[in-house]
């Protein structure tokens, strides 16, 4: 178009009133014929809005006079614009065209932080996927081009992944994400609806082709498919091929995939619609699939789409704007039948070497999965052989029963051969005889494949060096570079030197009949033996190894490498790894050692040395070999448990070690196998030991083991063997050895995962531990019979069948069906327990209720005592009674947990203070009683004070109306679970007391097993991917994370669990024992199994540590008031739960509507709000709130709603599990039915139709029935009552003894106390509280803890009390104390002064004042940081820096 036309258009446009304020000019037009578009180039001083562009287009169309697409591109007049101005003012314009082409990049380009560094623009974003996409598509170049074209500026652009932005604003965005999903799926549903309408028959060209990807879009009218069948879960039957998930991107359109579902998430919108997200993998990658479920599909889809489903999915691949990655919006889901790997052989093998997730940080498959797979394969048995432990046995036992298969219980132990002397083949040689100390250098590690290149030797006689031997050897092969690097021996140095055939006879002549000595003799002597064998000769000389000699003589050395031993003894070793120098150094070590043994140990000859060494051998320093131990029968199980226990308790050093002599001692009932390449036999074959030596080693084993070649492929990489053929030769050698010795040889997999695909999980776990070869995973999967036959076909058909099938079956047939854990229960026994419990109960009950017991008491007592004694539970009660009595005797109250408070016998035997009888009065004088049996009173504590009408004495008020059935079941035959809260500072004393009760060796801490948690696994996965530069979908990260969870990391102990073995039994009939976390420095011994697996067989006592008894003990010490005498219905105390007025402060002053700060159970923000909502007026109300706050779906979305809407009140809502049974019985439901309904509801199982019908028949209101149906878990009333009793007693001290209350609270509970801040007063506290409250959901756990302390400190100041500053001489180490002017914080209340430092200062100040900061630091051994903290607080005011006096002070 002509320039005149352009000018005319410019004049017309500029006359428009809407545009005349803008400075712009059309510079040219471009006609794009292909798209029928007129591109208009505009130069402008200002940004153009969409409305302004629209007006310009109208003018152009009018001037042209025909219809055409008009595209406006404008650039800014940039005579002096900077890069920063481009980003700040014109960034939207820069990105406009890119976003048109790639809409998904809007989030990255417009909402990401941008940093300018010189000429470089850095765009940071939290989506690794999108950043990778941007860089792959070279979007950075496009941005750079636009900036150059429009602004004339040269720049660099980088789009950078920033992990810190990955979860930013996640919570705020989640709701929007769900709305976006809903919107997207509604569109999909509309499309489906349109597709389902009848359509005209289309031509074959228009029919929809389900080819896995349809990038050209999805034609609604062409969607025509097969009708639904029984495998159709959603939508229609899917025809056509699938594509790999890894090939899907945001441009894939409609795709069809198939795979395994490994996780599902269900989200319900506010409108009640269900969004199902499930994660699916085809093992090329994984992807999230989302679908918005219509009511008609909901039940069917949710019932079928679960973890483990194998299915086919068709839907649209689309970018999820919030997950920031591609997901599939599902239209169709079909169930598929997965073709699994099966063992189709007629005769099946048996796997005898299998690891589970209990092989710590090494294997990735649970025992249950392994046993299930073996059963699916049709195998008659499968062995479980974890590294050093047997912790998978309980799960394996359950799985064996479920799958009807025999499990062979075993372990892959760590053998320490404590039967190998220092001198092999030695007799009575004196230390003054001849010894030849030698060393060799070689081309590699294999005596079979590598060559000797140097021999150096020194001869000793009478303890002195008398001769030497030294020569290079021409290996006739090239010396590897790494050997030259190590030894400095080059090819030129050995070329032309004598060969080994020439050298070896001369060397052996030099040796004569001497004792051969070498450091790590197996290596050097192995090469000599191999070369002598090639010459048809054998080595007969005695051989001494200075490695075990050094371990024996110099036990302080952690490592005994030659250079380290030499350094320790002050012996020169200048050219380490040269044969001559190493031999001389070893000779000097031997000289020194001979002298030491003669002079200090009275050892003068080889025989005495061997005897003393073997009798005092330190197993913890011996080299280890793998060994398989299988239990043949029940005796074998017990002996195996003894071996595992000894390995962990007596011989643990980095690994649980098993001395060979101990295995021999406990060998009865066991089958011993030679294990893998780390076994003693395989190592010996690899080292080239003689046939005689191999037979001696093999004689210890019942069977020999060989494994697939690829299992040991790493030996080729390490240079130990030449190639795969040599690996086969090693297996052949073991097979031939077995045949010669008549020992079965078996082929095993050494399984560490189930299927080939699973190796990725082990790869990640090993990489996370720093293994450099983690990516070179051998195929340690569970092979079928045919797969194993193929692996060993090189042995020949007959031998192959023998090792794979016949011999594995033979070993399996040797094993009986055994029980690693017995089925029965074995309670401890105390002679006369039944009579003792009956007597103490009757004595106590008569002392309270009189000789003629009220009917309600007698009836309850008879029922409970009969159930307890007839079912054998008296001993459990007696144990609990003795523990509580011990604590009370020592001055510490005990709180009961759980439902033990529902047992009246527990109350009368002083196990619990909670009285489960109906509310009542009883006279302490004449024993008259009045019971309230109509349900009008929930707790006796709320009865008004009253005097006995018969004698005038003040009535005792008691009873909380808790049915006995909650604790022992309706028939009274449910095993009681007595949990007790002892003072945390007294807990260890009670634990020790259990040993007094039952005897040492019958009491063990309950063991736990710590596994890789999801968060840790996620960290392993992310680290693995980042280190390798791999970018995968979040769904794939999720899959990898799931695969890495549940793997054992460590062992531990339950905080209060004690397992008790009857004194006529022993622990090895149940499980092995060990130290927690294998800590050899503790005297604590735990069960080897997780306590859950044996808690049904042995008694578990829960002796827990708790703050409340500690608090009450300290309060009693400070005030002299016995907490047991405190009334439970003091009006002022009860008022605290609705108002702070009783504290002398208003809610406006305090900033809180209640006065429950710091009270156990009632001080949290959540419960404080419950108090505001419910306005409790009684002890019973507080019990209900305790129940409501501890249940799941009992308050929120349940009682809270029904109270708010007026259906019920706090008094009548369902709060604890016992409420249901009591209420239904008052409604005239049969007791058994009431109990059954209570049990179902408390476990979250809801109500049956029959239950609902019966309840309605008895006039139970609808809201009550609905409330029952919503409950997931309920708290027992006995537990709630016990908690509230403690809380009310502590609240009493808060009201009436404020100094004691705050002193105690901060001493016992305030771990995060910051004395520096809090001592500044209430204004400083208020300011910090406001700062922390402003953080909202971003507040950290530590900050939450500080906020709680600040709230209580602020309350204290408002009550007129104050804190004194920490004082170096007046403050205690760890306890707050009351002084005349206020409460003095301890030294450890300063952030930066730990408990140990504080205690050290207090101990040292007893010996006099500190004369300087230096004196304080040196005497108390505290750090400079502690000194600075004390100084900053003012504790060291006036104290000089050092001990030196200044002359010029």
Curated annotation (Swiss-Prot):
<dbReference type="InterPro" id="IPR040982">
    <property type="entry name" value="DNA_pol3_finger"/>
</dbReference>
<keyword id="KW-0235">DNA replication</keyword>
<feature type="domain" description="Exonuclease">
    <location>
        <begin position="435"/>
        <end position="590"/>
    </location>
</feature>
<dbReference type="InterPro" id="IPR044923">
    <property type="entry name" value="PolC_middle_finger_sf"/>
</dbReference>
<feature type="region of interest" description="Disordered">
    <location>
        <begin position="194"/>
        <end position="231"/>
    </location>
</feature>
<dbReference type="GO" id="GO:0003677">
    <property type="term" value="F:DNA binding"/>
</dbReference>
<dbReference type="InterPro" id="IPR004013">
    <property type="entry name" value="PHP_dom"/>
</dbReference>
<feature type="compositionally biased region" description="Basic and acidic residues">
    <location>
        <begin position="217"/>
        <end position="229"/>
    </location>
</feature>
<dbReference type="GO" id="GO:0006261">
    <property type="term" value="P:DNA-templated DNA replication"/>
</dbReference>
<dbReference type="GO" id="GO:0005737">
    <property type="term" value="C:cytoplasm"/>
</dbReference>
<dbReference type="GO" id="GO:0008408">
    <property type="term" value="F:3'-5' exonuclease activity"/>
</dbReference>
<comment type="function">
    <text>Required for replicative DNA synthesis. This DNA polymerase also exhibits 3' to 5' exonuclease activity.</text>
</comment>
<dbReference type="InterPro" id="IPR004365">
    <property type="entry name" value="NA-bd_OB_tRNA"/>
</dbReference>
<dbReference type="InterPro" id="IPR011708">
    <property type="entry name" value="DNA_pol3_alpha_NTPase_dom"/>
</dbReference>
<dbReference type="Pfam" id="PF02811">
    <property type="entry name" value="PHP"/>
</dbReference>
<dbReference type="InterPro" id="IPR006308">
    <property type="entry name" value="Pol_III_a_PolC-type_gram_pos"/>
</dbReference>
<keyword id="KW-0540">Nuclease</keyword>
<dbReference type="InterPro" id="IPR024754">
    <property type="entry name" value="DNA_PolC-like_N_II"/>
</dbReference>
<comment type="similarity">
    <text>Belongs to the DNA polymerase type-C family. PolC subfamily.</text>
</comment>
<dbReference type="Pfam" id="PF01336">
    <property type="entry name" value="tRNA_anti-codon"/>
</dbReference>
<keyword id="KW-0548">Nucleotidyltransferase</keyword>
<dbReference type="InterPro" id="IPR012337">
    <property type="entry name" value="RNaseH-like_sf"/>
</dbReference>
<dbReference type="Pfam" id="PF11490">
    <property type="entry name" value="DNA_pol3_a_NII"/>
</dbReference>
<dbReference type="GO" id="GO:0003887">
    <property type="term" value="F:DNA-directed DNA polymerase activity"/>
</dbReference>
<keyword id="KW-0269">Exonuclease</keyword>
<dbReference type="InterPro" id="IPR003141">
    <property type="entry name" value="Pol/His_phosphatase_N"/>
</dbReference>
<dbReference type="InterPro" id="IPR013520">
    <property type="entry name" value="Exonuclease_RNaseT/DNA_pol3"/>
</dbReference>
<dbReference type="InterPro" id="IPR036397">
    <property type="entry name" value="RNaseH_sf"/>
</dbReference>
<dbReference type="Pfam" id="PF17657">
    <property type="entry name" value="DNA_pol3_finger"/>
</dbReference>
<dbReference type="InterPro" id="IPR004805">
    <property type="entry name" value="DnaE2/DnaE/PolC"/>
</dbReference>
<protein>
    <recommendedName>
        <fullName>DNA polymerase III PolC-type</fullName>
        <ecNumber>2.7.7.7</ecNumber>
    </recommendedName>
</protein>
<dbReference type="InterPro" id="IPR029460">
    <property type="entry name" value="DNAPol_HHH"/>
</dbReference>
<dbReference type="Pfam" id="PF00929">
    <property type="entry name" value="RNase_T"/>
</dbReference>
<dbReference type="InterPro" id="IPR012340">
    <property type="entry name" value="NA-bd_OB-fold"/>
</dbReference>
<keyword id="KW-0239">DNA-directed DNA polymerase</keyword>
<keyword id="KW-0963">Cytoplasm</keyword>
<dbReference type="Pfam" id="PF14579">
    <property type="entry name" value="HHH_6"/>
</dbReference>
<keyword id="KW-0378">Hydrolase</keyword>
<feature type="compositionally biased region" description="Basic and acidic residues">
    <location>
        <begin position="197"/>
        <end position="208"/>
    </location>
</feature>
<dbReference type="InterPro" id="IPR006054">
    <property type="entry name" value="DnaQ"/>
</dbReference>
<keyword id="KW-0808">Transferase</keyword>
<dbReference type="Pfam" id="PF07733">
    <property type="entry name" value="DNA_pol3_alpha"/>
</dbReference>
């Amino acid at each position: 178009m002509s320039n005149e036309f352009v000018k005319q258009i410019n004049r017309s446009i500029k006359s428009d009133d809407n545009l005349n304020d803008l400075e712009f000019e059309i510079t040219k037009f471009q006609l794009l014929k292909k798209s029928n578009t007129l591109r208009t180039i505009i130069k402008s001083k200002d940004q153009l809005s969409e409305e302004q562009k629209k007006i310009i287009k109208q003018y152009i169309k009018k001037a042209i006079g025909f219809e055409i697409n008009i595209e406006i591109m404008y650039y800014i007049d940039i005579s002096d614009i900077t890069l920063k101005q481009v980003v700040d003012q014109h960034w939207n314009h820069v990105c406009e065209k890119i976003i048109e082409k790639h809409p998904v990049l809007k989030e990255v380009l417009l909402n990401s932080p941008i940093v300018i560094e010189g000429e470089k623009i850095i765009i940071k974003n939290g989506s690794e996927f999108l950043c990778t996409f941007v860089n792959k598509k070279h979007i950075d170049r496009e941005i750079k081009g636009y900036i150059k074209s429009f602004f004339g500026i040269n720049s660099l652009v980088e789009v950078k992944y920033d992990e810190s932005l990955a979860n930013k604003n996640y919570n705020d965005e989640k709701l929007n994400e769900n709305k976006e999903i809903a919107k997207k799926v509604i569109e999909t549903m509309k499309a489906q609806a349109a597709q389902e309408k009848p359509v005209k028959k289309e031509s074959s060209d228009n029919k929809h082709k389900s080819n896995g990807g349809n990038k050209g879009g999805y034609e609604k009218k062409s969607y025509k498919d097969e009708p639904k069948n029984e495998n159709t879960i959603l939508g229609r039957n899917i025809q056509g091929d699938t594509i790999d998930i890894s090939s899907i991107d945001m441009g894939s359109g409609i795709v069809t995939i198939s795979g395994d579902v490994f996780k599902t998430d269900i989200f319900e919108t506010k409108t009640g619609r269900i969004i199902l997200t499930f994660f699916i993998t085809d093992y090329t990658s994984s992807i999230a699939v989302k679908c918005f479920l219509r009511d008609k599909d909901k039940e069917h889809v949710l019932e079928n789409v679960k973890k483990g489903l194998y299915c086919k999915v068709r839907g649209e691949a689309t970018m999820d704007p919030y997950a920031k990655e591609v997901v599939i919006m599902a239209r169709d889901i079909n169930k598929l039948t997965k073709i699994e790997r099966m063992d189709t052989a007629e005769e099946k093998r048996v796997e005898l070497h299998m690891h589970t997730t209990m092989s710590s940080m090494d294997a990735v498959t649970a025992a249950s999965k392994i046993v299930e797979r073996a059963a699916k394969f049709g195998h008659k048995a499968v062995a479980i052989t974890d590294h050093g432990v047997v912790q998978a046995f309980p799960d394996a036992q359950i799985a064996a029963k479920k799958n009807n298969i025999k499990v062979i219980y075993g372990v892959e132990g760590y053998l320490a051969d404590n039967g190998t002397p220092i001198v092999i083949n030695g007799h009575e040689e004196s230390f003054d005889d001849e010894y030849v100390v030698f060393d060799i250098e070689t081309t590699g590690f294999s005596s079979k494949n590598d060559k000797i290149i140097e021999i150096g030797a020194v001869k000793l006689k009478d303890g002195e060096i008398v001769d030497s031997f030294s020569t290079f050897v021409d290996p006739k092969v090239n010396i590897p570079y790494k050997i030259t690097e190590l030894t400095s021996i080059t090819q030129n140095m050995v070329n032309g030197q004598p060969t080994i055939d020439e050298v070896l006879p001369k060397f052996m002549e030099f040796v004569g009949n001497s004792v051969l000595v070498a450091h790590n003799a197996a290596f050097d002597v192995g090469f000599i033996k191999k070369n002598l064998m090639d010459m048809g000769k054998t080595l007969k000389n005695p051989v001494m190894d200075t490695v075990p000699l050094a371990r024996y003589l110099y036990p302080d050395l952690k490592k005994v490498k030659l250079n380290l031993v030499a350094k320790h003894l002050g012996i020169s070793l200048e050219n380490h790894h040269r044969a001559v120098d190493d031999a001389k150094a070893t000779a000097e070590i031997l000289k020194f050692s001979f002298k030491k043994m003669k002079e200090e140990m009275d050892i003068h000859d080889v025989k005495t040395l061997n005897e003393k060494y073997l009798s005092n051998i330190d197993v913890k320093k011996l080299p280890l070999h793998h060994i398989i131990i299988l239990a043949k029968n029940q005796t074998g199980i017990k002996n195996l448990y003894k071996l595992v226990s000894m390995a962990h308790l007596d011989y643990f050093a980095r690994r649980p070690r098993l001395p060979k002599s101990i295995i021999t001692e406990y060998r009865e009932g066991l089958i011993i196998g030679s294990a893998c390449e780390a076994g003693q036999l395989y190592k010996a074959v690899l080292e080239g030991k003689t046939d005689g030596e191999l037979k001696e080693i093999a004689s210890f084993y019942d069977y020999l083991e060989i494994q697939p070649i690829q299992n040991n492929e790493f030996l080729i990489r390490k240079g130990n063997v030449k190639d795969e053929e040599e690996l086969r030769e090693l297996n052949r050698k073991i097979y031939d050895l077995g045949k010669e010795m008549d020992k079965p040889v078996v082929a095993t997999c050494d399984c560490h995962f189930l299927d080939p695909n699973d190796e990725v999980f082990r790869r990640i776990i090993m990489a996370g531990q720093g293994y450099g070869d983690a990516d070179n995973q051998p195929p340690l999967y569970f092979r079928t019979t045919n797969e194993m036959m193929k692996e060993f076909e090189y042995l020949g058909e007959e031998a192959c069948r023998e090792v794979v099938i016949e011999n594995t079956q033979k070993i399996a047939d040797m094993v009986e069906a055994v029980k690693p854990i017995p089925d029965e229960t074995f309670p401890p026994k105390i002679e006369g327990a039944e009579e003792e419990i009956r007597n103490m109960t009757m004595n106590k009950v008569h002392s309270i209720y009189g000789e003629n017991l009220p009917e309600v008491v007698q009836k309850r007592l008879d029922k409970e005592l009969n159930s307890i004694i007839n079912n054998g539970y008296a001993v459990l009660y007696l144990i609990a009674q003795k523990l509580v009595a011990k604590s009370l005797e020592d001055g510490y109250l005990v709180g009961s947990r759980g439902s033990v408070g529902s047992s009246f016998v527990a109350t009368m035997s002083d196990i619990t203070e909670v009285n489960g009888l109906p509310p009542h009065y009883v006279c302490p004088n004449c024993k008259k009683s009045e019971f309230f049996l109509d349900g009008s009173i929930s707790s006796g504590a709320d009865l008004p004070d009253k005097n006995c009408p018969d004698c005038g004495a003040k009535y005792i008020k008691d009873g909380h109306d808790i049915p006995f059935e909650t604790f022992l079941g309706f028939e009274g035959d449910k095993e009681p679970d007595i949990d007790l809260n002892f003072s945390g500072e007294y807990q260890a004393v009670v634990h020790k007391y259990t040993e007094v009760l039952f005897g040492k060796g019958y009491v063990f801490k309950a063991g736990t097993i710590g596994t890789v948690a999801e968060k840790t696994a996620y960290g392993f996965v992310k680290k693995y991917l980042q280190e390798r530069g791999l970018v995968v979908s979040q769904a794939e990260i999720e899959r990898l994370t799931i695969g890495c969870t549940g793997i054992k990391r460590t062992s531990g102990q339950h905080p209060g669990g004690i397992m008790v073995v009857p004194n006529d039994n022993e622990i090895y009939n149940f499980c092995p024992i060990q130290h927690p976390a294998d800590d050899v420095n503790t005297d604590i011994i735990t069960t080897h199994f997780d306590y859950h697996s044996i808690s049904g067989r042995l008694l578990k006592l829960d002796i827990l540590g708790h703050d409340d008894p500690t608090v009450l003990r300290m309060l009693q010490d400070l005030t002299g008031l016995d907490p047991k005498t405190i009334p439970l219905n003091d009006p002022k105390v009860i008022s605290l739960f609705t108002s702070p007025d009783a504290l002398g402060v208003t809610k406006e002053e305090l900033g809180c509507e209640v006065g429950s700060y710091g009270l156990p159970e009632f001080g949290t923000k959540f419960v404080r709000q419950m108090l505001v909502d419910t306005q409790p007026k009684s002890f019973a109300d507080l019990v209900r709130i305790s129940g409501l706050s501890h249940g799941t779906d009992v308050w929120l979305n349940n009682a809270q709603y029904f109270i708010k809407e007026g259906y019920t009140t706090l008094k009548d809502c369902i709060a604890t599990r016992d409420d249901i049974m009591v209420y239904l019985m008052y409604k005239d439901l049969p007791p058994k039915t009431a109990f059954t309904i209570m049990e179902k509801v408390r476990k979250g199982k809801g109500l049956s139709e029959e239950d609902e019908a019966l309840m309605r028949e008895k006039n139970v209101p609808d809201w009550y029935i609905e409330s029952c149906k919503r409950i997931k878990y309920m708290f027992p009333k006995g537990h709630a009552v016990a908690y509230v009793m403690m809380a009310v007693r502590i609240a009493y001290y808060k009201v009436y003894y404020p100094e004691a209350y705050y002193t105690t609270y901060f001493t016992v509970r305030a771990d995060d106390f910051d004395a520096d801040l809090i001592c500044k007063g209430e204004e400083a506290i208020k300011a910090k509280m406001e700062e922390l409250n402003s953080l909202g959901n971003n507040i950290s756990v530590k900050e939450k803890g500080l906020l709680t302390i600040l709230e209580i400190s602020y309350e204290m100041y408002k009550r007129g009390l104050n804190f004194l500053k920490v004082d170096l001489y007046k403050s205690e180490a760890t306890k707050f104390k009351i002084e005349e002017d206020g409460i003095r914080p301890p030294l450890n209340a300063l952030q930066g002064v730990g408990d140990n430092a504080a205690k050290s200062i207090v101990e040292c100040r007893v010996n006099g004042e500190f004369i300087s900061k230096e004196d304080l630091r040196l005497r108390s051994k505290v750090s400079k940081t502690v000194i600075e903290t004390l100084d900053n607080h003012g504790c060291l005011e006036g104290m000089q820096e050092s001990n030196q006096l200044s002359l010029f002070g």
